[in-house]
Amino acid sequence: MPLFRKLGFVNVKYNHGNKEFGKDVTFARRTEFDEYEYYGVQVKFGDVSGGANGDINELITQAKDAFSMPFYDVYSRNKVRISKVIIAISGKFTLNAVEKIIEGIQEYPLKNNLIFLDGEKIESLMSKYSRF
């Protein structure tokens, strides 16, 4: 979570539990239009493959929940909705996992607001921003 703060995000909050609706972590950034844009992060340990297992379906369901279920932002004291969902994993996205997740979300605008971070990308960002 310190990485998100170093990237300039604010209101970083850990939400893991049964009422997180696909958002293990939430945070925001102020846009160029002086409005807040909210992000949700679904965190998974290990690799995610495009094989016939429950990981893909679970991630699709959680991403849909993250977009559709508002959350209470304790900082603004308002119910808000996520604009972007980040799927962050400690391992790698293997085979066709990313494609299956994107295609599993039917709504076109939502597909364009998914961000995939694997362990290598996370390490690279941490290394780059740990200097600041």
Predicted regions and their residues:
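Mixed-charge (Asp/Glu-Lys/Arg
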Residues: 1-132
